[in-house]
Amino acid sequence: MIKKLPTSPKIGMVSLGCPKALVDSERILTKLRSEGYNLSSQYDEADVVLVNTCGFIDSAKEESLDAIGEAMAENGRVIVTGCLGNEANRIRERFPDILAITGAQQYEEVVSAVHDAAPIEASPYVDLVPEQGLKLTPRHYSYLKISEGCNHRCSFCIIPSLRGDLVSRRADAILREAEKLVAAGTKELLVIGQDSSAYGVDLRHQEYRWKDRMVKADLTDLARGLGELGAWVRLHYVYPYPHVDNLIPLMAEGLILPYLDIPFQHASPSVLKRMKRPANEVKILDRLTKWREIVPDIALRSSFVVGFPGETEQDFQYLLDWLDEAQLDRVGAFRFEAVEGAAANAFDGAVPEEVKNERYQRLMEKAAQISEAKLQAKIGRDIATIIDRTDGEGGASGRSYADAPEIDGEVHLRDADNLKIGDIVTVRVEDADEHDLFGVALS
């Protein structure tokens, strides 16, 4: 009589928050799959549902609690992890029947909780997992986390209390992971960390052997190594330290994309001081000018906080004037929101909500004007574009070097019947609006 093999439990996953949390989810699922667990995208088919939460601001916490509530209603067997897991009592008050709660980066605790909730009889099946691990992004791009935590103590932020101080990964381990991703079809590597430009500080910029040379735990050396793998390399969360200047020649060489995501947060010296952000806004403008002298087409993205406690109309106007000079390609903005545990909560000079909203609108209007002018200047030019979507009716959408997934603009193509997701093609730009480009593929 043939013995029937046991059926492996199925795990569902809801991943919320930033790309760094997405990488955490990928790591957890890779581990569980390697042990033989199956994965399910349906609540009613899963034996256990994992909810990886965000706990940075109140709106994100509410979104996480809503997701937990949905998982409880649709399935009932739920394990919570991620940043909101640090507030276990709050979660238990609303959902007393949660199976287990763990905090951010507590990978072993999550896996152990799954073992308790849905024991698996099979032996580990490492061959069930592709060499590059499991991914939650499309095949053609991947987030590559190079560090965890942050050494800064910005007054509006609680990341260090959620994720700890800076912990950098070994340079050789990062390059090995990136090489596997590229071999598996990744065309674009999105480098992330809480503070990517601080990479390697905790390792004292130690050198590691990578193939036939030594690679330093330093963002510039690491970026060079990544650029040699043949994929697009896009740098995110780059704090504007002086050594960031060393990345610009790599862009000029074509090793990494001419794109930097730099969270300036504000420009007014008084606001930056209260935020505990040491950047000098005048020197930053000088550096942007020098970067553009080396790489004229460099795309610069940043995010800003409006309505920070004590922000005056003069401070805000300073920011708008600074944006006129900086001419950033992509801008995101957030209305200040008190975060439990942040020092800024105790600051005087709270800005009324209606003023925050009005300033937010003015900032985004300014950013849109700048963006539209810069995109209009690209009409008639040919740009490389990576394809993200096809519509089956001859249309396609993708992104240029100046566009990160989900947060920046897109390039919309006509007559794109022969294009596939992940293709990198040359597009002639025919039109533009405030955020997107429109054109036709030449190759």
UniProtKB/Swiss-Prot annotation:
Residues 9-119 form the MTTase N-terminal domain. Residues 376-443 form the TRAM domain. [4Fe-4S] cluster 2 binds at C150, C154, C157. One of its GO terms (cellular component) is cytosol. [4Fe-4S] cluster 1 binds at C18, C54, C83. CDD domains: Radical_SAM (cd01335). Keywords: 4Fe-4S, Cytoplasm, Iron, Iron-sulfur, Metal-binding, S-adenosyl-L-methionine, Transferase. InterPro entries: Elp3/MiaA/NifB-like_rSAM (IPR006638), Methylthiotransferase (IPR005839), Methylthiotransferase_CS (IPR020612), Methylthiotransferase_N (IPR013848), Methylthiotransferase_N_sf (IPR038135), NA-bd_OB-fold (IPR012340), Ribosomal_uS12_MeSTrfase_RimO (IPR005840), rSAM (IPR007197). GO terms for biological process: tRNA modification. It is an enzyme of class 2 (transferase). It catalyses: L-aspartate(89)-[ribosomal protein uS12]-hydrogen + (sulfur carrier)-SH + AH2 + 2 S-adenosyl-L-methionine = 3-methylsulfanyl-L-aspartate(89)-[ribosomal protein uS12]-hydrogen + (sulfur carrier)-H + 5'-deoxyadenosine + L-methionine + A + S-adenosyl-L-homocysteine + 2 H(+). The keyword Iron applies. Binds 2 [4Fe-4S] clusters. One cluster is coordinated with 3 cysteines and an exchangeable S-adenosyl-L-methionine. GO terms for molecular function: 4 iron, 4 sulfur cluster binding; aspartic acid methylthiotransferase activity; metal ion binding; protein methylthiotransferase activity. SMART domains: Elp3. Residues 136-373 form the Radical SAM core domain. It is found in: Cytoplasm. Belongs to the methylthiotransferase family. RimO subfamily. This is Ribosomal protein uS12 methylthiotransferase RimO. It comes from Zymomonas mobilis subsp. mobilis (strain ATCC 31821 / ZM4 / CP4). The gene is rimO.
